Curated annotation (Swiss-Prot):
It comes from Saccharomyces cerevisiae (strain ATCC 204508 / S288c) (Baker's yeast). One of its GO terms (cellular component) is nucleus. Keywords: Activator, Amino-acid biosynthesis, Coiled coil, Cysteine biosynthesis, DNA-binding, Methionine biosynthesis, Nucleus, Phosphoprotein, Transcription, Transcription regulation. This is Transcriptional activator of sulfur metabolism MET4. Residues 614-642 are annotated as: Leucine-zipper.
């Protein structure tokens, strides 16, 4: 091992100086440390594989030998920092590199995931062509994040340094990166003990810290941009995504707010807020969907790692970031679709709500006491009875609403039917009734003539409309009259035959019929009142209309002759004809009501007769019961007397007499 290391020591030293800088302090064993680094040839990978087998034992042994931060006395007393320890430490670093840095074979399996880290530009034809690969020297951001998180963990301690208590970003700024001097930090707890210069310098630590902060800032800015936009970055959306990445390792690292739930400590905790897994990209361009980008469409991907530690770390980060990404995606979708979606209306589950609570909010029918008791005896609960009452109230209200709607419909239809009829009546009246000849009279007659014409037309219209209303409201009155005419004749015949008979029941029936006829007339008058109101007003208006003739009937002035022409006669005939029709309609209604009253009265009389028969039968039964009670009482007294006689005599003769008396008594009872 050492011979191979001596041949390749110069190449490794140059690479080491290029990466980490050159130590300013001199040490006699520095050359030996450069020659005995144990790295071997950079071109041969077999040594890395060989060292990987001994990595676990080296790590455990080094951790056993590695002093803690607070163990100062042991560190000062033991000689851990001699030239013999250097190869083991470097071998430990090589084992770490071999375990945590994936091989080329492992990288080829992730080509479809790594290619999507590049940027593409959309040309005019709509096909996206890949531009130059990102200038980031560290292609695999996820690999770098896992690597640096292992270095930045609190439990990881380099053997050549004491980790400061406040090793934050402010202590390692960009100004220290340009400095070529190597300042050895003094620790008061180690009694101003200086660090051996053959180990890795502070510049290496500054480089790693700045690299860690730069990666962290890049990922955090990416997360912030995705969180603000509510969606993933699209290829070719804006010019900000097309410029190559230029790392600024020498600048000051950006500051981040320390979250108590995410950061394990102030000193560069694990990558808890870094988006290791890449989110999905929308590959739609301005002119269509790119086929190549669809083939390389990146899904949520976890890189394949050869080390168990790296797999655990990447899995934890990926799961946490997937959860964050899903939550942000749901929030963004809800924000974008809030204006398009209808509000979510939640209907309560009525099956969970008790019946008593539901019934208190609903109208209920008052349940009588008898019905309530019968329902309870049938096995119903109070809640069930209340529910039945609520259902009955609902149906009752529904019927009322339906009846009101039907009445409104009927009123509307009647109005629509009566409107053209009244219009035709007015037209007929305007044709039939000529202008009055009072226009040739003086001013007094002229002043009264317009009112007369208006009143006459209105009177005729109202009178005819009342007749039509009667016909509309009672369209089946003629049919009813014709159907019940033979029944009326039968009633008349029965009345005549009953009149010839001289029984009391017949006289009583005649009296009932007379009272029923009077009641029928009253009912007919009550029913005809709404229709006769118009006729009464018509009569008044007709009287006003005839007032211009000087009260024809009362005063009989000669003006009667003047106006008794053929037209007035026709008008009077029409009036009389309408009045006769009205009287006929009233008679028909009265007859119908009379028939109904007669039938009801007959049924009432039958009920009364049945009641009388029942009363008489009950009276007879009570008399029979009383007679039986008397007989029983007499028999009991006779038995007592017989017993007394038997006890007093005590002889056979007395017994015989008693028996003879019994026989006589029984014979009497049987005869009765």
């Amino acid at each position: 091992m050492k011979q191979e290391q001596s041949h390749e020591g110069d190449s490794y030293s140059t690479e080491f100086i290029n990466l980490f800088g050159k130590d300013t302090a001199t040490h006699p064993s520095s050359n030996n440390g450069a020659n005995n680094n144990g790295m071997g040839s950079t071109n041969s990978l077999d040594q890395f594989v060989a060292t990987a087998s001994s990595s676990s034992s080296l790590v455990t042994s080094s951790e056993n030998r590695r002093p803690l931060i607070g163990d100062v006395t042991n560190r000062g007393n033991t000689n851990l920092y001699d030239h013999a320890v250097t190869p083991e430490i470097l071998l430990e670093q090589l084992a770490y590199v071999d375990n945590f840095i994936p091989s080329l074979d492992n990288e080829f399996s992730n080509v479809d995931w790594n290619v999507n880290t590049t940027h593409n530009n959309a040309n005019n034809n709509g096909a996206d062509t890949f531009s130059s690969i990102n200038a980031n020297p560290f292609d695999l951001d996820e690999q770098l994040a896992i690597e640096l998180s292992a270095f930045a963990d609190d439990s990881f301690i380099f053997p050549d340094e004491d980790k400061p208590s406040n090793n934050n970003n402010n202590s390692n700024n960009g100004n220290d990166d340009h400095s070529n001097h190597d300042v050895l930090h003094e620790d008061p707890s180690t009694n101003n003990r200086q660090r051996n210069p053959h180990f890795l310098t502070q510049r290496r630590n500054t480089f790693l810290t700045s690299q860690y902060d730069q990666s962290k800032s890049r990922f955090s800015s990416k997360n912030k941009r995705n969180g603000n936009n509510g969606e993933t970055n699209n290829f070719g959306d804006n010019m900000q995504n097309n410029h190559p990445f230029e790392p600024n390792f020498m600048g000051s690292p950006s500051q981040f707010p320390a979250d108590a739930t995410n950061m394990t400590s102030i000193d560069h905790g694990g990558f808890t807020n870094v988006d290791i897994t890449s989110t999905e990209n929308n590959t739609t361009g301005d002119n269509g969907v790119d086929a190549l980008s669809n083939l390389l469409h990146r899904t949520t991907h976890t890189p394949n790692r050869s080390s168990p530690l790296s797999n655990v770390t990447s899995a934890q980060n990926s799961s946490s970031q997937q959860r964050k990404h899903s939550e942000s995606k749901v929030d963004s979708n809800s924000d974008n679709n809030s204006s398009n979606k209808a509000p979510n209306i939640t209907v309560p589950d009525y099956s969970i709500i008790p019946t008593s609570v539901l019934v208190t909010l609903l109208p209920r029918v008052n349940v009588p006491n008898g019905a309530y008791n019968s329902l309870i005896s049938a096995g119903f609960d109070n809640d069930q009875i209340d529910a039945i009452a609520a259902i009955m109230a609902y149906h009752h209200q529904k019927k009322i609403r339906e009846n009101n709607s039907n009445n409104n419909k009927n009123i509307n239809t009647n109005d629509s039917q009566e409107a053209p009829i009244l219009k035709n009546i007015n037209e007929l009246l305007s044709v039939l009734i000529p202008p009055s000849p009072a226009e040739t009279r003086g001013p007094t007659t002229l002043s009264t003539s317009p009112s007369f014409n208006e009143h006459g037309v209105v009177a005729e219209a109202s009178f005819l409309s009342s007749i039509l209303e009667l016909g509309i409201k009672h369209p089946k009155s003629n049919n009813i009259h014709n159907q019940r005419q033979p029944s009326r004749n039968d009633h008349k015949i029965s009345r005549e035959s009953d009149g010839n008979n001289g029984n009391d029941n017949v006289h009583h029936n005649n009296a009932v019929i007379k009272s029923s006829t009077t009641r029928g007339d009253e009912i007919a008058k009550i029913r005809s009142e709404p229709t006769l109101n118009a006729s009464s007003s018509d009569h008044k208006e007709n009287s006003l209309k005839r007032s211009h003739s000087g009260d024809l009937k009362n005063k009989k002035v000669p003006v009667d002759r003047k106006y008794s022409d053929n037209e007035d006669d026709e008008y009077d005939d029409a009036d009389l004809h309408g009045f006769e029709k009205k009287q006929l309609i009233k008679k028909e209604l009265g007859d119908d009501d009379e028939d109904l009253l007669i039938q009801s009265k007959k049924s009432h009389q039958k009920k009364k007769l049945k009641e009388k028969e029942l009363e008489s039968s009950i009276h007879e039964l009570t008399e029979i019961a009383a007679s039986l009670q008397k007989r029983i009482h007499t028999l009991e007294t006779e038995n007592k007397l017989l017993k007394n006689l038997v006890l007093s005599s005590g002889e056979t003769e007395g017994i015989k007499k008693a028996e003879s008396l019994k026989k006589q008594i029984f014979e009497k009872v049987q005869k009765e």
